[in-house]
Amino acid sequence: MVSISDYYLKLKIEQLQLEGDKAFKKEQEKQEKERQKELLKEQEVVLKEIEAAKTKLEKERAHYEQQLEKHPSEELQNKIQEIDKQIADNDWRNAHQSAGYVYIISCDDMKPMLKIGTTRRLDPYQRLTELSNASHAFKFKCHAMIFSEDAFGLEATLHQEFAQYRVNKVNQHKEFFEVPIDKVANVLYTKYSIKDKIDLNPICEDYIASKGM
């Protein structure tokens, strides 16, 4: 009968632990690279959106200035002032790369999970449309869209707040939490004084129609 000494067994266990730690670290590094790649990709999209918006607004401003020279009116002056504000807002978004939206969404084929994520897109709902891809039977429903000057910081704070409800506790970049939306709303209102409207029960028309068939 072959016996394994305690010393050898201890060495083997330590070896397996080291190999496991190495594999875990490698997977974490891979996940972080994927996250950085995704952030860079979105940043490129945002910069293109900002540049396109700037071009459009400047063109509109030039048009209304020409109209104002020909037909002076308070209405045209107000329109130019409104465009100037939009240009200033656009420039501000370009200068503040931490500004964006924290979204809280869910999908009827993933009950009762919530996804808490961040986007810097000028129209954040475009990002939700992209997330509602072919891997989901229904579109994501939006419970909240919260603008923040430090969107990534707010997202990290909320992820930490609801860490015990995280579905995937290994991959920290999987942003799904099995937590009731009313609990999230209560924490946002009472602890963080976030006054944005929280929709506790948004409707997915495709889901409602499918259930009725």
For the regions a protein language model found, what residue spans apply to each?
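Non-catalytic accessory segments flanking enzymatic or RNA/DNA-binding domains
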Residues: 1-213
